[in-house]
Amino acid sequence: MEHIYVGRKNGEKTQGGVYHYLYNEETQKLSLLGLEDVLQGFTYIALTYNRTRLAATGQDSEGHDLLVGYQLDTPDKRLKRCGQVRVGTAGDICHLSDNRAGTLLLVTDFVDKAVHFYEFLPNGAPGAFLARVPFEGKSTGYRQGSSHPHSAYFSPDDRYALVADLGANTVWVLRCQPADNRFDLVGSWRAPDGYGPRHIAFHPNGKYVYVLMEITGHIAVLELHSNGQLTLIELIFAVSPAYETVEGSLNAADILVDMKGERLYASYRSVQEIDVFGIDRRTGKLSPLGYAPTRGMVRGLHWGRSGVLCALGEELP
């Protein structure tokens, strides 16, 4: 059995908050267990790497952005709200991640043109604000008139944080020194104009970085060097021939590498498909393997505990 936590916004028939589901791998059925916590203005949710804590973002009754922390280490995997803090973002949080050590939370705000670092306490509560790192830049495509960070991720060794800035058309590299409250910009890679970096996936070896371009659908394969510099290995286009008929943005959404570093998955909302690539472990390069229809707009891709289940966050058209 796989426990799945889904954040939902307020709707005509749904209450905003974190919902708890149970997935039966044998029957392939997903059952709703209930609403775990009411969270108005929900925006993003993230499960820690050790799967004992969860963080989510929403808003309080006065409209301020909130960062909320939970524990889920009980036998029934129910959530316990452990604390919350107001965050100084601009009301458009679009991504949330934690480091492998479980000591930091990284909040990305599309409108704020910045990422925010917070402590993540062992009891599941968000801790002190550490730093806000702003960015500048622009490009030629839609929503690229200024910096608009779309997501940010810690490298597998926790030394760096990589930011996919759709607006500035750039991947930024920050060196993380939380003991000194320092998160310095040490590297960057700029995509071809109009591509729009959206989400990032790391190979388990920490050497190869895969960047999904929301607008064009390309995937950039980059090498992350020990000094924080990025170099391009290759740019590869999507698999499905259906993409050739799309006018405008492909609306690529999420990208994921499997736990063994052998396969890469990328979701494309415009054609409602997931593309699958093989990974050459020696070079990091990709080879197309196929694609699958999703019958809906897949916004998020996540691995289950077993490494077999791929949970899809579906966005209805």
Describe the function of each predicted region.
Residues 32-102:
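Blade-loop segments of beta-propeller domains
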Residues 4, 54, 105, 161, ...:
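Hydrophobic beta-strand positions that form the internal "hydrophobic ladder"
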Residues 9-11, 59-61, 110, 120, ...:
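Short loop/turn segments immediately following the C-termini of beta-strands
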Residues 78-151:
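Asp-box/WD-like beta-propeller blade repeats and closely related beta-sheet repeat scaffolds
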